[in-house]
């Protein structure tokens, strides 16, 4: 485990570099475009408006109730799915850096999550506008969203590291994950709330992303997530990190040869 701990500590020591790389990557993607990174916000806004109008009719719900919930769910899903999908090719895309520079491996998954967090921060503008149009009774319970988001980040990091290693060894993993995520989207309470879907609730709660969405979204509307939601997500973090550390410790020396 010394290899894992050493790599992680070195990565944390390079946090300023990680933030700079994530910011530069985001900025470079929209260089010379008229709106720059605001295209991120515009894309999220179009998704919220379009899906909000359609699903409020299909689900026969008031827009004032559905759209705020949909906005948070959609922004979280874009963040989570972005981390999951891109992590399958993280080490492959950073192959030149990995081969030529002696940097810790954890830098690359952390950079991915930081970059996705920057995108999420841009998209929060959409949430602010929605909450102005459809005000919600925000209270002290809403602070639990921050705790929930921290738990989500802890889980996403081990998921990203795990998928980065597997994706470096098996290149087909990227296509498999990309094909599965649209299906998982409809099994995740993004467009609806977990208790409102007209499908088997057991299927929804077998989906780990359901817990991630619930942890962050429910407190914003004054609802404290059930105890089992915290128990399962914390348990996922403990078990997931344990498996990831074992796999990383065993296969990290081979990553440079795989890519």
Curated annotation (Swiss-Prot):
<keyword id="KW-0812">Transmembrane</keyword>
<dbReference type="GO" id="GO:0015920">
    <property type="term" value="P:lipopolysaccharide transport"/>
</dbReference>
<keyword id="KW-0813">Transport</keyword>
<feature type="transmembrane region" description="Helical">
    <location>
        <begin position="179"/>
        <end position="199"/>
    </location>
</feature>
<feature type="domain" description="ABC transmembrane type-2">
    <location>
        <begin position="35"/>
        <end position="248"/>
    </location>
</feature>
<comment type="similarity">
    <text>Belongs to the ABC-2 integral membrane protein family.</text>
</comment>
<dbReference type="GO" id="GO:0140359">
    <property type="term" value="F:ABC-type transporter activity"/>
</dbReference>
<keyword id="KW-0472">Membrane</keyword>
<keyword id="KW-0997">Cell inner membrane</keyword>
<keyword id="KW-1133">Transmembrane helix</keyword>
<feature type="transmembrane region" description="Helical">
    <location>
        <begin position="35"/>
        <end position="55"/>
    </location>
</feature>
<keyword id="KW-1003">Cell membrane</keyword>
<feature type="transmembrane region" description="Helical">
    <location>
        <begin position="146"/>
        <end position="166"/>
    </location>
</feature>
<feature type="transmembrane region" description="Helical">
    <location>
        <begin position="228"/>
        <end position="248"/>
    </location>
</feature>
<dbReference type="GO" id="GO:0005886">
    <property type="term" value="C:plasma membrane"/>
</dbReference>
<keyword id="KW-0625">Polysaccharide transport</keyword>
<dbReference type="GO" id="GO:0015774">
    <property type="term" value="P:polysaccharide transport"/>
</dbReference>
<comment type="function">
    <text>May form an ATP-driven O-antigen export apparatus, in association with RfbE.</text>
</comment>
<dbReference type="Pfam" id="PF01061">
    <property type="entry name" value="ABC2_membrane"/>
</dbReference>
<keyword id="KW-0762">Sugar transport</keyword>
<feature type="transmembrane region" description="Helical">
    <location>
        <begin position="112"/>
        <end position="134"/>
    </location>
</feature>
<dbReference type="InterPro" id="IPR013525">
    <property type="entry name" value="ABC2_TM"/>
</dbReference>
<feature type="transmembrane region" description="Helical">
    <location>
        <begin position="202"/>
        <end position="222"/>
    </location>
</feature>
<protein>
    <recommendedName>
        <fullName>O-antigen export system permease protein RfbD</fullName>
    </recommendedName>
</protein>
<feature type="transmembrane region" description="Helical">
    <location>
        <begin position="65"/>
        <end position="85"/>
    </location>
</feature>
């Amino acid at each position: 485990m010394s290899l894992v701990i050493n790599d992680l500590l070195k990565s944390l020591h390079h946090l300023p570099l990680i933030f700079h790389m994530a910011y530069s990557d985001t900025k470079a993607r929209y260089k010379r475009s008229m709106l720059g990174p605001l295209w991120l916000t515009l894309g999220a806004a179009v998704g919220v408006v379009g899906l909000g109008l359609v699903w409020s009719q299909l689900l026969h719900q008031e827009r004032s109730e559905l759209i705020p919930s949909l906005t948070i769910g959609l922004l979280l899903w874009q963040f989570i799915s972005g981390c999951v999908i891109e992590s399958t090719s993280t080490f492959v895309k950073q192959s030149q850096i990995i081969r030529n520079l002696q940097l810790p491996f954890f830098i690359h998954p952390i950079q991915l999550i930081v970059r996705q967090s920057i995108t999420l921060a841009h998209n929060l503008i959409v949430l602010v506008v929605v909450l102005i149009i459809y005000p919600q009774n925000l209270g002290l319970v809403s602070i639990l969203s921050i705790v929930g988001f921290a738990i989500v980040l802890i889980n996403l990091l081990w998921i990203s590291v795990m998928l980065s290693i597997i994706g470096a060894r098996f290149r087909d993993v990227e296509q498999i994950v990309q094909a599965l995520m649209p299906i998982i989207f409809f099994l995740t309470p993004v467009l609806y709330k977990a208790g409102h879907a007209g499908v088997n609730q057991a299927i929804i709660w077998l989906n780990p992303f359901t817990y991630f969405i619930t942890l962050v979204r429910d407190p914003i509307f004054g609802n404290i997530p059930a105890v089992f939601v915290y128990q399962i997500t914390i348990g996922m973090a403990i078990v997931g990190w344990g498996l990831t550390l074992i796999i990383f410790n065993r296969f990290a020396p081979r990553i440079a040869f795989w890519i």
